[in-house]
Amino acid sequence: MNALAATSRNFKQAAKLLGLDSKLEKSLLIPFREIKVECTIPKDDGTLASYVGFRVQHDNARGPMKGGIRYHHEVDPDEVNALAQLMTWKTAVANIPYGGAKGGIGCSPGDLSISELERLTRVFTQKIHDLIGIHTDVPAPDMGTNSQTMAWILDEYSKFHGYSPAVVTGKPVDLGGSLGRDAATGRGVLFATEALLAEHGKGIAGQRFVIQGFGNVGSWAAQLISEAGGKVIAISDVTGAVKNSNGLDIAKLMKHSSENRGIKGFDGGDAIDPRSLLTEECDVLIPAALGGVINKDNANEIKAKYIIEAANHPTDPEADEILSKKGVLILPDILANSGGVTVSYFEWVQNIQGFMWDEEKVNNELKTYMTRGFRDVKEMCRSHHCDLRMGAFTLGVNRVARATVLRGWEA
């Protein structure tokens, strides 16, 4: 089942639990606007190249639409639509005043020079600048994009609308970015994991963790979990996987990964088959890479007691059912990885106020939001007798539905 089908299925189950009117249910599912633009740029060699860009603006009942822009060769309308919808529910679960959006350009950023990436970003911004804005739609980095990409968007947008630092988040700090933003998603994973474990009388210390993915989210999660006393025993990235039953030295692994462009060859553990990583014996499994990695083919072999979804849509619905029967608790992506968009909200607030927070305030506020989000999800679980995923979806959908009705938008 692809991401769009799975997200829509979860929404429909939540709508049924909430008893939503069928017309309201339909209106919440259909995107507010879908944008498709052609972006032609001159390459460094003088030839012209054309790319297709997308922006799906799903819902704005609770505030400006919010979501990343990704550069990847497999970007397609269905994926962007699914991720935009997911952002609507995610921002509602986090209880930040946003709706959901997502964007992307079908390209391979590794095959483009910095100059070509800049030209592509500026052309894309020119095509959508009148459809985004501080109080309309606020983009952010995603796969294949970063703070520099946001700086280019900010600059190009400002040519049309005047200097507007709040039009994007995830910017460099020198252009109004927030302290703590780089670590935000990984730190949010830590706080969410702490909340889940505390519910069962446990803490981070002494728990054995396996993490799939060692990019921004996975590496920060590993570092912060290790600092909190957790034992990270296995990690993988695109180059390979490494295991040390006594716990990996995360600081050394990060240094090795930076110097060698991956964890392959790290001498602080044993190399293992990346395909076996998800089924390693552990207490907590954190998929922090691609979607759909936990499926009906490997769900029965998973030995973790808890799964924290740091990636978007890492668990297929079929696997969900298998793991539920095994008693595995899954903290869903729309709660577990909401730290990034939460600190993006803090950045937006700081830009509008013209007042910068220190990093301690950012981190303290993030912990408050993540802990409260978990508590709110648990309350929905008790009210509707459902698991954590459906508790999160019912919470998010209910908040958006209430805002829609209050604004008089129901069909």
From Swiss-Prot:
<keyword id="KW-0520">NAD</keyword>
<dbReference type="InterPro" id="IPR014362">
    <property type="entry name" value="Glu_DH"/>
</dbReference>
<comment type="similarity">
    <text>Belongs to the Glu/Leu/Phe/Val dehydrogenases family.</text>
</comment>
<keyword id="KW-0521">NADP</keyword>
<dbReference type="Pfam" id="PF02812">
    <property type="entry name" value="ELFV_dehydrog_N"/>
</dbReference>
<dbReference type="GO" id="GO:0005739">
    <property type="term" value="C:mitochondrion"/>
</dbReference>
<dbReference type="GO" id="GO:1901698">
    <property type="term" value="P:response to nitrogen compound"/>
</dbReference>
<dbReference type="InterPro" id="IPR006097">
    <property type="entry name" value="Glu/Leu/Phe/Val/Trp_DH_dimer"/>
</dbReference>
<feature type="transit peptide" description="Mitochondrion">
    <location>
        <begin position="1"/>
        <end position="18"/>
    </location>
</feature>
<dbReference type="InterPro" id="IPR006095">
    <property type="entry name" value="Glu/Leu/Phe/Val/Trp_DH"/>
</dbReference>
<keyword id="KW-0496">Mitochondrion</keyword>
<keyword id="KW-0809">Transit peptide</keyword>
<dbReference type="GO" id="GO:0006538">
    <property type="term" value="P:glutamate catabolic process"/>
</dbReference>
<dbReference type="InterPro" id="IPR006096">
    <property type="entry name" value="Glu/Leu/Phe/Val/Trp_DH_C"/>
</dbReference>
<dbReference type="GO" id="GO:0004354">
    <property type="term" value="F:glutamate dehydrogenase (NADP+) activity"/>
</dbReference>
<dbReference type="InterPro" id="IPR033922">
    <property type="entry name" value="NAD_bind_Glu_DH"/>
</dbReference>
<dbReference type="GO" id="GO:0006995">
    <property type="term" value="P:cellular response to nitrogen starvation"/>
</dbReference>
<feature type="active site">
    <location>
        <position position="102"/>
    </location>
</feature>
<keyword id="KW-0560">Oxidoreductase</keyword>
<dbReference type="GO" id="GO:0004352">
    <property type="term" value="F:glutamate dehydrogenase (NAD+) activity"/>
</dbReference>
<protein>
    <recommendedName>
        <fullName>Glutamate dehydrogenase 1, mitochondrial</fullName>
        <ecNumber>1.4.1.3</ecNumber>
    </recommendedName>
</protein>
<dbReference type="Pfam" id="PF00208">
    <property type="entry name" value="ELFV_dehydrog"/>
</dbReference>
<dbReference type="InterPro" id="IPR033524">
    <property type="entry name" value="Glu/Leu/Phe/Val_DH_AS"/>
</dbReference>
<dbReference type="InterPro" id="IPR046346">
    <property type="entry name" value="Aminoacid_DH-like_N_sf"/>
</dbReference>
<dbReference type="InterPro" id="IPR036291">
    <property type="entry name" value="NAD(P)-bd_dom_sf"/>
</dbReference>
